[in-house]
């Protein structure tokens, strides 16, 4: 997967890797990963950091080396393609283009897809995705809903 990256991308990722690799030993530890993530406003637990490292740690060293980091970044870039698909899907649901999906818009699209839903079922779908409780689904809520499927 990492072999699909351009030289420019690889050198950008090398730079990013160096930012993570605080002590310059060629690997990223959970401690280093945590430091960088906290500097980006995230607050991962030790277990989450370990999971992130284990996901790409192919040689079982408990750390991420540069080839493993490239694999991780290549995966993330592939995932961003699906982000474009999610944006497209949101636009399909958001008939009036106001940035929100209302119950009526959701019902309309589901009916067009051949799903016969009761008002209660549509309301339930909205309720499940509607994190801020305003009765409609905004883009962030839609992304969360799609990513959790």
UniProtKB/Swiss-Prot annotation:
Pfam families referenced in this protein's UniProt entry, alphabetically: EF-hand_7 (PF13499)
The UniProt function text for this chain reads: Calmodulin mediates the control of a large number of enzymes, ion channels and other proteins by Ca(2+). Among the enzymes to be stimulated by the calmodulin-Ca(2+) complex are a number of protein kinases and phosphatases.
Protein name per UniProt: Calmodulin
Gene name, please? CALA2
Ligand binding (Ca(2+) 4):
130, 132, 134, 136, 141
Q: Which family does it belong to?
A: Belongs to the calmodulin family.
Q: Which InterPro entries match?
A: CALM/Myosin/TropC-like, EF-hand-dom_pair, EF_Hand_1_Ca_BS, EF_hand_dom
User: Per UniProt, which keywords does this protein have?
Assistant: Calcium, Metal-binding, Methylation, Repeat
What positions does the entry give for Ca(2+) 1 binding?
21, 23, 25, 27, 32
SUPFAM superfamilies hit by this protein = EF-hand
Positions of Ca(2+) 2 binding: 57, 59, 61, 63, 68
Q: Spell out which residues are annotated as carrying N6,N6,N6-trimethyllysine.
A: 116
Annotated residues for binding of Ca(2+) 3 = 94, 96, 98, 105
In Gene Ontology terms, what is one molecular function of this protein? Answer: calcium ion binding
What is noted besides the main data? This protein has four functional calcium-binding sites.
Whose protein is this, by species? Trypanosoma cruzi
The protein's superkingdom reads: Eukaryota
Domain named EF-hand: which ranges? 8-43, 44-79, 81-116, 117-149
Instruction: List the GO cellular component terms.
Output: myosin II complex
Give the classification, highest ranks.
Answer: Eukaryota, Discoba, Euglenozoa, Kinetoplastea, Metakinetoplastina
């Amino acid at each position: 997967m990492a072999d699909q990256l351009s030289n420019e991308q690889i050198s950008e990722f090398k730079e990013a890797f160096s930012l993570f690799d605080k002590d310059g030993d060629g690997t990223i530890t959970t401690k280093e990963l945590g430091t960088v993530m906290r500097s980006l406003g995230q607050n991962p637990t030790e277990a989450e950091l370990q999971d992130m490292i284990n996901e790409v740690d192919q040689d079982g060293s408990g750390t991420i080396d540069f080839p493993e980091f490239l694999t991780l970044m290549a995966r993330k870039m592939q995932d961003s393609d699906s982000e474009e698909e999610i944006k497209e899907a949101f636009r399909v649901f958001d008939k009036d283009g106001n940035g929100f999906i209302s119950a009526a818009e959701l019902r309309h699209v589901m009916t067009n897809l051949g799903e016969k839903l009761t008002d209660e079922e549509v309301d339930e779908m909205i309720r499940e995705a509607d994190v801020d409780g305003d009765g409609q689904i905004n883009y962030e809520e839609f992304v969360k809903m799609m990513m959790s499927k």
